[in-house]
């Protein structure tokens, strides 16, 4: 596929153009993301874990791809994201970078790779950028990790924050529960989001919070908010791609299924097996002379 065939994308020098409508190809940057919020332009983010899928999403015009620690669930088969390590995610991130030409690729910092100190966070982030080619990293937490964000940003690492339902803290939260209900809890989450913004984060994910709180945080922050179960008023929306495409066996309430990929794959595998059993595959068309 030539560069002329790819969906157009904004370059930093073309901030007046929409995120989905620039004239020349080029990687999406944090400046483009900021400009989209200033224009009131909403955009989508998806997870990706391999080059082939990432390339499809890139061709579809998805401007930001997240190599999430959700790979623990949908790639490695863990019940939570907690077992995921930097060494798990670096090859996945590198594959997504290689498979794309336009999307910004954000890598999750997994549990245990950054919480101890800002220096530990920088070490992990540097590995993702040097070894995998990530364009930014994401970490979970609010006020407590603000010094970590400040350290990373000061070293030249773009940082995406994440507050609300933070899967790495699932045990401390008592399970996958909606966060920020009630005025006091909502105020705490707003304070956390503002702390991330003040520390230099270029965007913040809002997960599993009431719609009204998502709107309030979005209106308060100058940086973009990315909702996942946070209502329709966030600046952007993100889904795990297996949930979005109907590959996951179970999906959370906030995940709309836009396809039934599981059924398509199951039918294809069933038909293939039946053809082989019947001697109907391979035919001469699929054989060499």
Language-model features and meaning:
Residues 2-259, 263-289:
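Alpha/beta enzyme core
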């Amino acid at each position: 596929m030539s560069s002329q065939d790819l969906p157009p994308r904004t370059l930093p020098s073309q901030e007046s153009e929409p995120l989905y409508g620039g004239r020349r190809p080029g990687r999406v940057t944090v400046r483009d993301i900021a400009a989209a919020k200033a224009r009131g332009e909403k955009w989508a983010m998806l997870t990706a874990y391999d080059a082939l899928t990432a390339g499809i999403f890139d061709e579809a015009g998805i401007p930001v791809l997240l190599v999430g620690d959700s790979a623990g669930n949908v790639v490695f088969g863990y019940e939570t994201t907690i077992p995921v390590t930097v060494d798990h995610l670096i090859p996945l991130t590198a594959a997504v970078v290689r498979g794309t030409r336009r999307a910004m690729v954000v890598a999750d910092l997994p549990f245990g790779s950054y919480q101890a100190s800002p220096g530990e966070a920088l070490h992990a982030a540097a590995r993702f950028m040097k070894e995998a080619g990530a364009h930014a990293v994401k970490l979970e937490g609010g006020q407590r990790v603000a010094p970590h964000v400040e350290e990373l940003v000061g070293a030249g690492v773009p940082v995406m924050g994440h507050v609300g339902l933070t899967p790495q803290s699932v045990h401390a939260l008592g399970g996958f529960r909606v966060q920020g209900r009630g005025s006091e809890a909502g105020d705490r989450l707003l304070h956390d989001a503002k702390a991330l913004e003040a520390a230099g984060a270029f965007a913040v994910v809002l997960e599993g919070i009431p719609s009204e709180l998502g709107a309030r945080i979005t209106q308060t922050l100058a940086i973009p908010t990315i909702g996942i179960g946070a209502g329709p008023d966030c600046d952007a929306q993100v889904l795990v791609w297996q949930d979005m495409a109907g590959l996951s066996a179970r999906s959370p309430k906030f995940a709309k299924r836009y396809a039934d990929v599981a059924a398509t794959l199951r039918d294809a595998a069933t038909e293939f097996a039946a053809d082989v059993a019947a001697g109907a595959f391979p035919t001469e068309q699929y054989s060499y002379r």
